[in-house]
Amino acid sequence: RSNKNCEFKTIRKIIYNQKNIAIEIQSQNIETNKIDYKETLNPKLPKGISNNKNIIALIDTGVNYTLPQLHKNIAFQNKKLLGYDFWDNDNFPFDQDPRNNPFYPRHHGTTVFSVLSREAPKSTIAIYRFPALNMCKFKELIEHIAKNSIRIVNLSMGSSNINDWLCFQEAALKNNKIIFVVSAGNNGFDIDKNPIYPASLKLDNIITVTSSDLNGRVGRGSNIGNISIDFMLPAERVEVIDHRGVKAFTGGTSYAAPRLTAMISRLITANPGISNEDILKILKKRSIKSNKKVTKYGWIPDPLDNYLFN
């Protein structure tokens, strides 16, 4: 990284192991030649005990599972972390997306996890790193979720290329008892006219959500669509824990989705045998219909309230 005079200020390098797998990013001070900062990639997994709590599956860029404040909500099975890294094909679904810049990887999943853990505290979360390099692995990913009897999935991502999501669509249709809560996207347009996938897929077990402010107005840049988008929730200023373990505020449809996922998870915890159809009925009763053609069912202003759950 250089300054405006093209003078180097920082050097970053990626360290690989003998199997040619990236294990660490090091930041070197150009003046002292000392390593100022190290970012571990795929660190050791935490130890945990198996639990039978209501499980949410989080499909994202991974999670920083080393953060102590997240451990109580990480799902374990046979004392091993429940989930998988379908990007790297290993058991370390650590939060990183190196596609734009491998020296400064993007992080996203940890913040989403933190919303789920705070708003569905009695649930545990299985961590899945999505298969960015081969999107047809979504078939295998969803089968893994189904095999572990997980009923609800949070998916805060999408793209405009339907070909990326054909295998996902096939697997989601086959496993139609699983509810997929999907973010509508932050492109600032109507996804009925400009589809974003998987949000725009016509599947009964996909619930698409967009973001609002506290007064029910569409969030800045949040997509709309009274056919493709089911609900709108306040998510323009959401407290999160980022991949460093630091509290911060963020917003957008990526965080409206986990708010609705957490709400559904609490509903399932209170009513373990509830059907997908009855879940949708309760969500519709909780929503306020707007005259504006923004969503199909309306705005849920109070996703932390358990009204109608018992």
Residue ranges of each PLM-predicted region?
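Protease zymogen maturation seam
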Residues: 1-55, 68-69, 298, 303-310
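Active-site core segment of subtilase-fold serine proteases
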Residues: 39-123, 140-152, 215, 290-291
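Short Gly/Pro-enriched turn/cap motifs at secondary-structure boundaries
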Residues: 46-47, 103-104, 187, 219-223, ...
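Hydrophobic/aromatic beta-strand patches that form the interior of the parallel beta-sheet core
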Residues: 57-59, 84, 126-128, 181, ...
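Extracellular S/T/G-rich loop segment that most often corresponds to the catalytic His/Ser-adjacent loop
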Residues: 60, 196-269, 273
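Glycine-rich, phosphate-binding/catalytic loops in enzymes
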Residues: 68, 72-79, 169-172, 197-200, ...
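Substrate-binding/access-modulating region of protease and related hydrolase catalytic domains
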Residues: 107, 111, 119, 123, ...
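C-terminal subdomain of the subtilisin-like protease fold in secreted/lumenal serine endopeptidases
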Residues: 150-157, 163, 178, 205-208, ...
